[in-house]
Amino acid sequence: MKKIVIAGAGAYHFAPAIFEDLFVSWRAPVEVWMVDSDIEMAELSARGAQALARAFGCEARFYYTTQLSKATFSADAVIFCADFLDEEGWKKDVEILEEVGLYKQARLRGGVGGAMQTMRVLDFMTDLATQMSEECPDAPLIICDSGFGGVQLARACECAQRMCGVRTLGLSGVTEQTRKRLALYLDMKEEDLDIECAGLNNFSWVTRLRDRKKDTDLIPRCMKEMQEDSREALSSQYIDWYGAIPAGERVMQYELLGDTEVSPKKTVLLSGVGLADYELRKRNLAMLTVHGPLSPEGAKAWGQIRTSGLSSVRPVEVLRALWGEKDCRVDNLNMPCDGAVEGVAPGRFVECPAVIGKDGVHGIAVELPVELHDLMGQLSLCNVLYAEAASTGSRAALREAMEIDPALAGVDLLYTEGVLSDMMEAQKEKLKRFF
């Protein structure tokens, strides 16, 4: 019986696919630990999953807790899908940056704001990975990213694998999200778009966009329309610079680049879901628990649950492939570069389509404009250095990362270092490795 720990069991975007694959499709004997900061969500997730397991004849044991540290002992795998957005810490970052006139550095992923967010998230991630290396050293860690939360996926993967020695892979839904965005923009049906995205997490680009019915390349049309559309100023800028269409549910690549006239003044936090969505999820889990998925009421609740997440992000399928049970293809896998993405040194984490099977993980080669190669090499090195700084408390690595961070281009480094030092001091209880 495999033991699987789900950290962020109530994660809106990922829980449906995890539940479906574990208890409806796979149905193998499994011990599942549901971990969530919301104890009610953790319990409802466990009970809802138990109802699925019973209905579909899956032998399973369930536990729930709010403390991840209690769940990892002897685990066969850990799936991390918590959003990890510290809103209180983020607000403090924004206040300080606005006070000193660096409001455009209030970002979640790049620059000063991104550095602070990285250090907060990776302080926790280092604790988790260190514990895994001691208590379940052979267990893979699968980190999921919705694009809305506070986890910088590439840096988290670098931290867990490179710094802590835990085998780590990351999953995102950027291709699925980009398909929805561009189908709406081009006034087409999603199923008619053949799309591929690759690059780095939060810095992915459209590498293929075709009309399935007509078998025609849609990239020239999409670029032309965006360059003529005042609402797509950011996309147009990147098309001019790099000859590529930015991927994602919304254009966020600016967070990892220097400021321009068209880049937003600061990042606006978008969760993708609201309180009402989570309350509906809880209600549906309760209905599923009481009625089971085979009754009309339970079937309706399960139907609403299973269609409300990201359908392409399936960590259980990845685990089965790693365990040699069933090969799988992943649209957007964050993995150590094996040559699939040009410009990035081997071993640094990239985001690309990949195949996972008995013989390992293999990225599928993609073609990105040469204008992006050096930049992605620079950003991937930034990810490594920020991960090293956050996991070890190295201020030397932090300074080195800031020196090459494209988001800090044109900003006085000495002044910025002083500002960041003040921000760290104000939240030193969350950055124990630096103090």
Task: List each model region and its residues.
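Rossmann-like NAD(P)-binding element
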Residues: V35-E40, A55-C136
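Conserved N-terminal Rossmann-fold NAD(P)-binding element of oxidoreductases
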Residues: I6-A9
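Extreme N-terminal starter segment of soluble prokaryotic enzymes
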Residues: M1-I4
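Phosphate/oxyanion-binding active-site loops and adjacent basic polyanion-contact surfaces
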Residues: A11-A15, M41-S45, Q117-F124, V174-T175
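Rossmann-fold dinucleotide-binding core
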Residues: P16, E135, P140-R221
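A short helix-to-beta-strand connector/capping loop
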Residues: A53-Y63, C164-V166, E191
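Glycine-rich phosphate-binding loop and adjoining beta1-alpha1-beta2 segment
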Residues: V24-F56
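Long, compositionally biased stretches enriched for glycine and/or charged residues
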Residues: L182-F435
